[in-house]
Amino acid sequence: MLYRSALRASCGFTPRLASTRSRLASSLVLLEHKAGRLNDASLSAVTAAKATGNDTHGILVGSMAEVEGVLKEAKKIKDLSKIYLATSDAYSHSLAEALAPLLASIVPTKDVSHVFAAHTAVGKNVFPRLAGMLDSSLVADIIALDPSRGTFTRPIYAGNAVLTVKSSPKDSVKIVTVRSTAFDKAAIADGSADVEDVEILAIESPTQFISEELTVSSRPDLASAARVVSGGRALKSKESFDKILDPLADSLGAAVGASRAAVDAGYADNSLQVGQTGKVVAPELYVAVGISGAIQHLAGMKESKMIVAINKDPDAPIFQVADVGLVADLFESVPQLVQEIGSIKA
C-alpha cells in the first residue's frame, strides 16, 4: 500500500473511485498501434474484453500524427461501441509514465469495471503502474476468463500448469493483460464505434523518448505470422542456420524463429527467440528444425495449430507435441523438402 501511495503521489494523481456505485458497466481496452496500424494483439484483447458481457470500449492514445490513420481502422472493430481518443505529443511512443496516469484518470469517470491490454511490451510496462495507481491487483497473461465466477486463467511453470485466480473483492477495477494467442482477433469489418475526446492530463514525466532501433525484415512479423520456421542448436552454426532455414522459410512464406539455445549460441538474433523468455506464437504452421523441445521453448509455441518437427533423435521431447514428425538428418531432409515444395509450386 505504501508503494502504491508513493506511486500515485509521484504522478500527482489521486483516484476517485466511487464506493457506492452498484454496477460498473463497461470494459476498456488499450488499443496499441505502430506505424499507422493497429497491433493485432490488441484485437485479441478486445475479444477477451467482450467476454465480460459488458459494453466494450477502446482507447487510442498518441500524438495526432500517430492516431490519425489508426482511428479510421479502429472505428470498424466489430465489438467496440465507443473509442476514447487522447491526442498529445506527450503520449507518443506509449511511455508508461504518461499513459498510466491518463488511464487512471479516465477509469473512475467512465464506469469501467475491467481494463484490458495485450500482454506485450507496452502492456507489461503500463499496466503494473496503472494497477498500483488504482490500488488494484494486476492479473497478467490470461488465457481464459469466466465472468460468471469472476475468475481468470493464466499459465504458470512455463505453460506446464494453469492457475485460476480471482481478484480481490476490494479491487473496484480489474486490470488485465491478455495472451493474444489464446483469443481470436476481433474482426475489423462493419463496426461503427462512436468517438469521444478525453481530457489531456498534464504530467511532467521523468522519462523521455530518445530513439528506437527496429530490425527490418522482408519476412512476416514473427509474433503474428501464419507460418513460422524455427531452428535449434542442432544447426551447428550461424552459417548453417541461415543456409538451411532461409530457403525453407522463403518457400513457405514464413517468419524465422529460433530456440533459446540457438540464440545463446549466436546463430540468431535475440528478437527471433521463441519461448518462455522470448515470443509466444500460435501460427497455423510451426516447423521446428533441429529443436529438441525444452520446456521453455514449448511454452512459446505449443498452441500452434499444426506442429511439424524435424530431428534425428527419435526421443526428442518436441515429438510429444508435434502433429507431424520426421526423424531424419536436417542437413539432408530440409533441402529435399524445399525442393519438393518448389516442385509443387511449379
From Swiss-Prot:
Q: Where in the cell is it found?
A: Mitochondrion matrix
Molecular function (GO) terms listed?
electron transfer activity; flavin adenine dinucleotide binding
- The record's principal subcellular location, in a coarse class, is mitochondrion
- SUPFAM superfamilies xref list: Adenine nucleotide alpha hydrolases-like, DHS-like NAD/FAD-binding domain
**Keywords in UniProt for this one?**
Electron transport, FAD, Flavoprotein, Mitochondrion, Transit peptide, Transport
SMART domains attached to this UniProt entry: ETF
* Cofactors (names): FAD
Q: How is the cofactor bound?
A: Binds 1 FAD per dimer.
Q: Tell me where on the tree of life, at the top rank, the source sits.
A: Eukaryota
Q: Which InterPro entries match?
A: DHS-like_NAD/FAD-binding_dom, ETF_a/b_N, ETF_a/FixB, ETF_alpha_N, ETF_asu_C, ETF_asu_C_CS, Rossmann-like_a/b/a_fold
Which positions in this protein are listed as binding FAD? 285-313
Q: Which GO terms describe its cellular component?
A: mitochondrial matrix
Any one of the GO BP annotations: fatty acid beta-oxidation using acyl-CoA dehydrogenase
Q: How does it assemble?
A: Heterodimer of an alpha and a beta subunit.
What the record says about family reads: Belongs to the ETF alpha-subunit/FixB family.
Please explain the role this protein plays, according to its UniProt record.
The electron transfer flavoprotein serves as a specific electron acceptor for several dehydrogenases, including five acyl-CoA dehydrogenases, glutaryl-CoA and sarcosine dehydrogenase. It transfers the electrons to the main mitochondrial respiratory chain via ETF-ubiquinone oxidoreductase (ETF dehydrogenase).
Q: What is this protein called?
A: Probable electron transfer flavoprotein subunit alpha, mitochondrial
Lineage of producing organism: Eukaryota, Fungi, Dikarya, Basidiomycota, Agaricomycotina
